[in-house]
A protein has these predicted regions:
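Acetyl-CoA-dependent GNAT
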Residues: 8-11, 15-85, 97-99, 103, ...
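Short, P/G- and charge-enriched loop/turn segments at secondary-structure junctions
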Residues: 41-43, 145-152
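Conserved glycine-rich acetyl-CoA-binding loop
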Residues: 62, 81-98, 115-121, 126
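A contiguous pocket-lining binding segment that forms or flanks enzyme active sites
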Residues: 99, 107-113
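Conserved beta-strand-loop-alpha-helix junction that forms the acyl-donor binding cleft
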Residues: 111-121, 137-141
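Acidic/polar short surface loop at catalytic or gating sites that assists cofactor/ion binding
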Residues: 126-148
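Alpha-helix-centered segments that form part of catalytic cores
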Residues: 150-162
Length: 177
């Protein structure tokens, strides 16, 4: 497994990975999420230019999982982590998250997620994230949640989560907030 920055010509592959990864939502009664359009190419390109776009690549150097993130209120906010189902359950999502934290410059990692989907909030809790109380939600995260609600994601319980930049158990892994 190798993690590297996504290239511009690979952006269409990220959309394919997200489509494939989203199919599992159909199986738990959330077909609207499975059918949701992945980010358009210009928006994905913005993460290359202004944020972070990482991929786990296979032996042929083709992305099989990806993570996009951007700075939000002093933390690196994970907008999306997707793993192609053919490569699921191999620790690729966790590896991308841990790699992001090691890039430096961020005091914490944040994300928003579905509270009751097994591979969402419960998974991220195992990766060291903790739910944020209402008073801990920063202005930038509030704006992200507002946009998610406008997109219809609030049909299911969602929450904001945060962890320190280092993996749980690593020296200095505690979340400073």
């Amino acid at each position: 497994m190798r993690i590297r920055t996504v290239t511009r010509d690979e952006l269409p592959l990220l959309r394919e990975i997200e489509w494939a990864a989203g199919e599992c939502f159909r199986e738990i009664g959330m077909p609207e999420i499975a059918d949701d359009e992945p980010l358009p190419l210009p928006e994905l390109a913005r993460y290359l230019d202004e944020g972070t776009a990482l991929a786990v690549v296979d032996a042929a150097d083709r992305p099989v999982a990806y993570l996009i993130a951007e700075p939000v209120d002093g933390a690196l906010h994970i907008e999306q982590v997707s793993v192609h189902p053919d490569h699921a359950r191999r620790g690729l999502g966790r590896a991308l998250i841990d790699h992001l934290g090691q890039l430096g410059g961020a005091t914490a990692l944040t994300l928003t997620t579905f509270a009751e989907v097994p591979w969402n909030a419960p998974y991220y809790a195992r990766c060291g994230f903790r739910p944020l109380a209402a008073e801990e939600i920063t202005p930038g995260l509030r704006e992200i949640r507002r946009q998610e609600a406008a997109h219809g994601l609030d049909r299911w319980p969602r929450l904001c989560m945060r962890r320190g930049p280092r993996p749980p158990g690593a020296p200095g892994a505690d979340d400073p907030a």
